[in-house]
């Protein structure tokens, strides 16, 4: 079941996500559909894990590990990686949801089956997402049923069969208090994650369909971003989560959005379109900083996710497969640059204090006598007192 030295690739990419590892290392887990010829299955679906090289902004040429799904499971359709980086959940077309553990080191790893989930017999789950603190898992079904589970004890918090017509997208807030969900019929609802209580249904115009949702993650004033289609115009609505009222909107992409993501530090918002474009905007100004036109030429972008530690996007489509794109945005400060700046500020402060001390008439500097002139300040050695200065001070140098 596990192949540690790579495997032959099968069908197209259907889902995927980044895996955060220690020391800012990152892996990518990808689900691939079975390869078929007519009604015959030539090779079953697989789950693969690749390493990421930040120097070349590319994935490894062969997977670190591969898990082959049973033919009865069908194809993988959604994945969610726990924030701890050791577990992930995968939903399949026929076998429900399965829990996997990533075992091993940085070069030789295994994907191991874990204990059965309560979601194994609930049918295909279009959306899977862990809360930011890893304490909850939400699953949104093609049938419109919403489930929220505690993690890791898997206690069922909510099972709402009629949450939506069919769940399209979902996201937890940064504090893991709220869950936002969208439907294929254009509606969007807000749920309290602790007990599953429905809090609000987002207001929308008569010609407006809410497609996607993401909470802000910068830790300041929290917002909810929703990609919506207003007639023929795609917009991003912004909602205040204290009132759940819309406070503004912005057009950030030319065609209808198919997927949406917010960077881990909350600085950037990305949209992938149904014709293969990618737009990245700064959240603070809502201005576009990066635009990749026809990144997946003529194909709807199915997967869009920011790398946890780099300004890099992972995208995929049915025809063009997975792509890793480095963003053309302003560079972030590196750790060594911050330390160098702090050291420079400290040295400037020390020099300023020294100059102030040498030129001050304070308790720590003996008061100037009558007719006494202030000594010259030397930065590179002790200056010798003049004869006039010695005569004006009969006590000589004073030591405290």
Give the role of each language-model region.
Residues 28, 88, 137, 179, ...:
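Hydrophobic beta-strand positions that form the internal "hydrophobic ladder"
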Residues 306-333:
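Juxtamembrane amphipathic/hinge helix adjacent to a transmembrane helix
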Residues 47-51, 97-102, 146-150, 188-193, ...:
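WD40-repeat beta-propellers
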Residues 331-399:
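C-terminal single-pass membrane-anchor helix
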Residues 2-7, 63-69, 109-118, 155-160, ...:
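A short beta-strand motif characteristic of beta-propeller blades
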Residues 7-12, 67-75, 116-124, 161-167, ...:
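WD40/WD-repeat beta-propeller blade N-cap
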Residues 32-34, 41-43, 91-94, 140-143, ...:
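Conserved strand-to-loop turn within each blade of WD40 beta-propeller repeats
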Residues 18-25, 80-85, 128-135, 170-177, ...:
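Loop/turn segments within WD40 beta-propeller blades
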């Amino acid at each position: 079941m596990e192949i540690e030295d790579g495997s032959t690739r099968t069908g197209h990419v259907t889902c995927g996500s980044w895996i955060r590892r220690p020391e800012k290392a990152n892996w990518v887990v990808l689900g691939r559909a079975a390869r078929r010829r007519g009604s015959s299955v030539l090779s079953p679906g697989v789950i693969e894990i690749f390493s990421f090289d930040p120097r070349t902004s590319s994935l490894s040429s062969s997977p670190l590990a591969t898990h082959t799904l049973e033919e009865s499971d069908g194809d993988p359709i959604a994945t969610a990686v726990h924030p701890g980086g050791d577990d992930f959940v995968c939903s399949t077309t026929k076998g429900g949801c399965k829990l996997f553990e990533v075992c091993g080191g940085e070069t030789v790893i295994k994907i191991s089956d874990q204990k059965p989930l309560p979601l194994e017999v609930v049918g295909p789950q279009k959306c899977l997402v862990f809360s930011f603190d890893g304490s909850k898992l939400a699953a949104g079904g093609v049938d419109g049923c919403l489930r929220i589970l505690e993690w890791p004890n898997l206690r069922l918090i909510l099972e709402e069969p009629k949450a939506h017509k069919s769940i399209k997208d979902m996201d937890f807030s940064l504090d893991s208090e709220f869950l936002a969900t969208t439907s294929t019929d254009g509606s969007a609802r807000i749920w309290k994650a602790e007990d599953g209580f429905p809090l609000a249904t987002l207001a929308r115009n008569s010609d407006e369909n809410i497609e996607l949702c993401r909470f802000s993650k910068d830790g300041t004033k929290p917002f909810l971003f929703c990609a919506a289609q207003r007639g023929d115009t795609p917009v991003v609505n912004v909602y205040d989560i204290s009132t759940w009222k819309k406070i503004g909107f912005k057009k950030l992409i030319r065609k209808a959005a198919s997927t949406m993501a917010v960077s881990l530090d909350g600085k950037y918002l990305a949209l992938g379109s149904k014709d293969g474009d990618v737009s990245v905007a700064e959240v603070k100004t809502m201005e576009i900083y990066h635009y990749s036109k026809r990144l997946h030429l003529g194909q709807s972008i199915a997967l869009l996710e920011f790398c946890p530690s780099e300004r890099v996007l992972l995208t995929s489509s049915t025809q063009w497969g997975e792509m890793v794109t480095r963003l053309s945005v302003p560079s972030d400060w590196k750790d060594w640059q911050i330390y160098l700046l702090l050291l420079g500020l400290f040295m400037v402060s020390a020099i300023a204090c020294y100059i102030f001390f040498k030129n001050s008439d304070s308790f720590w500097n003996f008061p100037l006598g009558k007719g006494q002139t202030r000594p010259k300040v030397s930065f590179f050695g002790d200056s010798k007192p003049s004869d006039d200065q010695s005569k004006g001070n009969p006590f000589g140098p004073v030591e405290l």
